[in-house]
């Protein structure tokens, strides 16, 4: 019988529970240790999941030689130091998205993984969605032809989650780095991961967290308090141009005066188009007639089992049973894109990569 993998979690905030569910679903994995600077939350989570090895310092947890792999689920500014420390301690790492708060940090993380010969996987969880797999099946079978223009949209009307998400020193940015990263990555992944060559972007801080709004925000972080600051953008838009001539148009917001929240990607190709919002629609021509096509089966993203699939893939990679489909190199490219959007927004000029 194979030895059980022992896993540690660094950062036991809201997103960690999705990782934990994935680990608990694997009979050959043991949830071994938790680490968090918030002692109250740490002990609550330890009691909830029956984990007794609890640490407030990552170095103490990572000193446990029996730990094989780690999930890094901290706020964004701690992704790099926690990931690098884990890799240097000889652990495999699954780091939540975004990989870091800058391309430079991300590159250092990648180098640490290579130096220590350990897996570094980035939590681009949308790649594991049922909707992604269906669209990719159509793309791989050339149903859409050459993809040359796409839209990546993630808009919230009133969705500033508070907590560390609005604090730029911890988050690295607002909806672009928190929400936009999901749809940018998913869209680029489906387009075949072309190389970005230039970016033009703009960011706005107009509505903040709507302090006078009497309606409850739609999304609230576990770390939210009445004293939270909001030093990030509330809306971002960008055009990303790639080496094959294709373009992605991006929109992401925490707060925006729109009718309702929007989460969709749109792909336009030479043979057809596709839209996920949330059900898949295909646009093509059949026998010379314009046709809109939907599938009999549900194609909307299902969160049921989404993170479990991501974790299962991570564990398979750790065991040498699979090749990682969400590697650190893709995280570095994403940070290059995000850095360029923020730089373009600051300077008012296109950024050549």
What function would you assign to each model-found segment?
Residues 1-49:
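N-terminal Rossmann-like dinucleotide-binding module
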Residues 1-4, 9, 29, 69-72, ...:
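C-terminal helix-rich "cap/oligomerization" subdomain common to oxidoreductases
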Residues 185-281, 309-316, 320-322:
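Contiguous beta-strand/loop segments that form the cofactor/metal-binding neighborhood of enzyme cores
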Residues 51-58:
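Conserved SAM-binding strand-loop segment of SAM-dependent methyltransferases
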Residues 11, 126-229, 348:
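Predominantly a Rossmann-like dinucleotide-binding segment in NAD(P)-dependent oxidoreductases
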Residues 64, 69, 75-76, 80-127, ...:
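Beta-strand-loop-alpha-helix segment that lines the small-molecule cofactor/substrate pocket
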Residues 33, 53, 69, 149:
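Short, Asp-centered acidic motifs that coordinate Mg2+ and/or phosphate
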Residues 95, 120-122, 151, 250, ...:
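Hydrophobic residues in well-ordered beta-strands that form the structural core
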């Amino acid at each position: 019988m194979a030895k059980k993998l022992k896993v540690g979690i660094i950062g036991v905030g809201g997103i960690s529970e999705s990782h934990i569910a994935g680990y608990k679903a694997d009979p050959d994995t043991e949830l071994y240790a938790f680490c968090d600077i918030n002692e109250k939350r740490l002990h609550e989570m330890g009691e909830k999941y029956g984990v007794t090895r609890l640490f407030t310092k990552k170095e103490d947890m990572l000193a446990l030689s029996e730990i094989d792999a780690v999930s890094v689920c901290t706020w964004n500014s701690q992704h790099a130091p926690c990931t690098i420390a884990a890799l240097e301690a000889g652990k495999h790492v699954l780091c939540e998205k975004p990989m870091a708060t800058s391309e430079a940090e991300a590159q250092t993380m990648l180098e640490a993984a290579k130096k220590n010969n350990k897996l570094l996987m980035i939590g681009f969880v949308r790649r594991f969605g049922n909707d992604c797999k269906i669209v990719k099946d159509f793309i791989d079978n050339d149903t859409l032809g050459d993809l040359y223009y796409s839209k990546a949209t993630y808009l919230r009307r009133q969705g500033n989650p508070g907590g560390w998400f609005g604090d730029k020193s911890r988050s690295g940015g607002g909806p672009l780095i928190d929400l936009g990263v999901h749809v940018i990555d998913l869209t680029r992944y489906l387009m075949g991961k072309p190389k970005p060559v230039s970016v033009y972007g703009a960011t706005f801080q107009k509505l903040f967290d709507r302090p006078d709004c009497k309606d409850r925000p739609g999304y609230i972080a576990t770390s939210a308090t009445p004293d939270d600051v909001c030093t990030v953008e509330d809306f971002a838009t960008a055009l990303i141009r790639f080496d094959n001539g294709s373009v992605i148009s991006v929109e992401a917001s925490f707060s925006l005066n729109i009718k309702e929240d929007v989460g969709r990607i749109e792909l336009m190709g030479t043979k057809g188009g596709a839209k996920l919002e949330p059900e898949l629609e295909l646009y093509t021509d059949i026998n010379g007639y314009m046709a809109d096509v939907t599938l009999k089966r549900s194609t909307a993203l299902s969160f049921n089992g989404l993170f479990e699939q991501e974790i299962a893939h991570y564990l398979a990679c750790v065991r040498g049973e699979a090749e990682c489909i969400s590697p650190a190199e893709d995280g570095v490219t994403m940070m290059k894109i995000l850095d360029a959007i923020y730089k373009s927004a600051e300077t008012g000029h296109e950024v050549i990569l």
